[in-house]
């Protein structure tokens, strides 16, 4: 999350996703792309928080090109595989977006 120390970034994203999972209202959709798709896959430290949000109606979308790039398509554990057209439409139609990089 953000630019800087990788360990700190992992701590911050874990804390952020836990916080989001415990608040109301939950977001309608969360989109994961680039290295963020690793968070939706087997072995992710935040997988339970993301699954909890999905179980409570949050749509989870992971970029298929990104999953292919990292060799993770078969390890996806939550949500659906999507493409940039759907990702663009989702972001474009949203009333507001929160972007983490």
Residue spans for each PLM region:
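Short amphipathic alpha-helical segments and helix-helix/interface helices
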Residues: 17, 47-51, 88
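A glycine-rich helix N-cap at a beta->alpha junction
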Residues: 46-72
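Ligand-binding beta-strand-loop-alpha-helix segment within the catalytic cores
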Residues: 61, 78, 91
